[in-house]
Amino acid sequence: MMKHILFIFITALFLSTSNSFSQSTEAFFKTADSFFKTYVSNGKVDYKSIEKNPEQLNELLDQAANISVSISEAKEYQAFWINAYNLAVIKGVIDNYPIDSPLDKDGFFDSIKYNLGGTSLTLNDIENKKLRAQFDEPRFHFVLVCGAKSCPPIIAEAYKPSALEKQLQEQTVKALNNPSFIKVSENEVSISEIFKWYNEDFVKNEQTEIGFINQFRKEKIPSNFKVSYYPYNWQLNQK
C-alpha cells in the first residue's frame, strides 16, 4: 500500500514539475514574441524606446534566468538559446547606450556575463557552447544577431519550437539571396566574414562555401567564381 501511495506521489510530482516547466517556457516565448514585435522592424532594433522603457526586456531576462531547457528537447532548447542570445545582445547595448557599435564596449561578446538558463555565461558561450558545440546547424549563423549592421537581420518575432525549422530556413534563404549580403559580380562573389570566422561550419564533407550558399539560392553561383570577404560593418543595427 505504501509503495503504491509513494508511486502516485512521485508520478504527481513529476507531472507537476513537467507542467510547470512547460508553462514557464511557453510564457517566455509569448513575452519574447511581444517584445520583438514591439521593438523590431525591418531588421532594426528601436534601442531608444527600449532604453526609455526597459521593463519588458528586464522581465524577459529574469524569466530566462530561471528557465531550464533540456537538449533532448532540441527545438525548445535551440529556440530558447537563440532568443536568449538576441535578447542579451540588446541588453548589452542598452546597458551601454548610446553606443555606435557593440565593439565600443570592451568584452561585449567574450567577457560580459548574463544569467540565463540557470547559469552565468557570455554571448560567445551561448553561441559556441550552447548551440554550435551541440548541433551541426550552420543556419544558426543567420538567426543569431550580434547587434551590427552586417549581421543577418533580426526578425520581429520570437523563435518558437513549433516554428523553428521554418524560421531557420526562411532567415537563411533571405540572407543568402540578399544582394547586400551575398555580392555577386563578374566571375567573383564577395561574402560576409561570417563565412571566414566560422568556415568549418560551412565546408564540411568537402563542401565549398559556394556549394553551401547555393543550397539556399534561387540564382546559383558558378562554382568556379572567386570568393572574397567584404569588411564587416560593426555599426549598430539601430532603427
Where are these regions (language model features)?
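Bacterial N-terminal signal peptides
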Residues: 7-17
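Interaction/scaffold regions that mediate signaling and macromolecular assembly across diverse proteins
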Residues: 24-239
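Positively charged n-region of N-terminal signal peptides that target proteins for export
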Residues: 1-5
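Sec/Tat signal peptide C-region and signal peptidase I cleavage site
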Residues: 18-22
